[in-house]
Amino acid sequence: MRKKTYLIASFFFILISISSGSAYALEERLYDVAVIGAGSGGCSAAIQAARMGMSVALIEESDWIGGQMTGAAVSTMDDKTKTRTGIYLEFITKVREYYSARNTSVNICYWGSDTVAFEPWVGQMILKEMLRKAGLVDIILKARPTSVKVTENRVRSAVVKVDGKEVLFSAKVFIDATEYGDFIALSGARYRVGNSISPKIDNNAIIQDITYPAVIKQYKDGLPPELKVQGAPPGYTDHLFKFRMTIRKNGSTWPGDYPFSPVVHNAYRAIPDPSNNAIIDGGKPETWTSITKTVINWANDYPGQNGSSPNLSVDFLESPNFRALATREAMLKTLAFLYYMQTELGMSDWSVDNRQGYGGWFSTDWADWVEFPEKYRPILSLFPPFPYVRESRRLVGIRTMTVDDILRDEKLGRTLTSKPHSLALGEYPIDIHGKNDSIYLEADLGETKEKIPNDWNGDGGLFQIPFEVFVPEKLDGLLAAEKNISVSRVVNGSTRLQPVTMLTGQAAGAIAAMSVIQKVQPRQLRPLDVQTELWRSKSRLSLFDFEDAPNYSASWAGVEAAMLYGYMDPLTEKFFGVYDKMHWVEVRDVFRRALGIQKFPDRELQALVTVSEFSSWLEVLFKKDIKRYQGVIDGLAGDKPLTKGKLASTVLALLKVAPEIKDKK
């Protein structure tokens, strides 16, 4: 009897176990591409991948999309005009259109006339619309990956906590576009943090300062009482000296010497205010007094130069508890600066903007912290949801960019050598907030303080970001975007800005989509195939912007490829010579450089070439493999002269179908 009872109990235990197992089975969602982080880079990656036909999950920890541009309120674009291309150009064009319809200028920041700024909520609205129109993109907010499954050296899936519930996301390719590089760390891929490499992380290493911006505006009809800072916030006196040395009531005008005036401060990060009918131009100082909306993001870097620490510890990235504490301290510093504005600077009718839509999710539980008394909550609740993070974990990729890759000629405004595998452009000068002494840089990469140029005089200049920095050295199924690409700390000082992160995000999205389309791992792709998609999206990849080859011309992509792979030379820095008529000697030399061919059909080398003659010549040249190239050859007809632009386009078409491409550096 006792044995029978045991068997019955065991049976019911098994039934309960099976039932419990199914009850706890995770919901699974399947996608082609999963983008972790909906910042500037993540949104661009999702848009590009969706436009290429992918199903995309865009997973974001906060309740905002747009990252540093919106959720961190760095909505004054740090561009130098030459990176206005691709999805970034689409985005700022929509920003201009939105404000133009409201008779409001966007060129009101950075003391310049050719600038772009917007309100964070407007930036988010535009990104959401771009994502909606891109294709199949599911935006999952307030969602955080907790674990990553890797089998056979490939990222397969990730468990994501969504509204307190764990959901399994499976994808063919994952992209880490988080603000901190958190997904890379979960994946097990090696990464750099400060000047050390995982898993041997030096806890004494440092990263750049963070900043907790705040959108503020002038309340001309009177400041709501709850938006007045009620007494000096904790730590105020610790920051007062720095505040006074940066901005003072009777400070200098721009350009000038520190400290600067409140008017100069407001013009630095000024953003549009459609309720203000004044005509404002960032390049005209006489209009700056009319600015009624700006962002606190100048004297409030955290930790700044205060205290004994030389910079922010890498624990900010590695330790959730330290991250939360540092974030709250950064909030306090910004609150202190707002108090300084309302008191010493005499800006008593200025405070946080109550119409940006902030106040939902926050990256830190500041409201439960004893250092934030109840009287500050009405103001802090209108702060952005998370800080501006300048330096994240950085993937160890197939290759790592160093300062040598971004040394630019001041006169030409670009690097002197081209990278054949370029997938994005950068332009910003090297800007490191904090210490850049050699002991804080990567010795294994040969980075030293002495090698860092002072490139602010030339306003930076163009450089290229190649395919290999997006792909892990070993792990498959994963790509990096945002500030997480494979670069040194010094290079991150130039690649962390919004225009660059949008362009590198677009590149990562193209790599991921092409990987799925071709059914190979990202590292197995031919960069030219990815470049072709980016050119289709009007994303410029070369160092040149020729006046005779605009991006809407038939020869533009061919000219881009010719400059990347070095098989043709331009007439000048500004003109390619698209309409120049080609001689056989020039055709021969181009094919030698582009395809490595040495033997050619006989022709009179000094004779001009017609398109039909070129077609016949190609049939003889590729006779042994004619099927491969026939489609390109059939598109060449007519007795018109073969132009340089037509030759460039034809060579690109041939390279696309060629069995392999030979890098010409």
Which stretches of residues belong to each language-model region?
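Beta1/beta-strand and adjacent pyrophosphate-binding region of the FAD-binding site
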Residues: 28-39
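Flavin (FAD/FMN)-binding glycine-rich loop and adjacent Rossmann-like elements that form
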Residues: 162, 166-173, 177-535
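Conserved beta-strand-loop-beta-strand element in the redox core of flavoprotein oxidoreductases
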Residues: 149-168
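Conserved N-terminal/central alpha/beta ligand/cofactor-binding core
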Residues: 48, 54-55, 60-147, 151, ...
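Boundary at the C-terminal end of the N-terminal hydrophobic targeting segment
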Residues: 21-25
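N-terminal Rossmann-fold NAD(P) dinucleotide-binding loop
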Residues: 42
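Bacterial N-terminal signal peptides
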Residues: 9-18
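Short, solvent-exposed alpha-helical surface patches in non-cytosolic proteins
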Residues: 60, 553-565, 572-623, 632-658
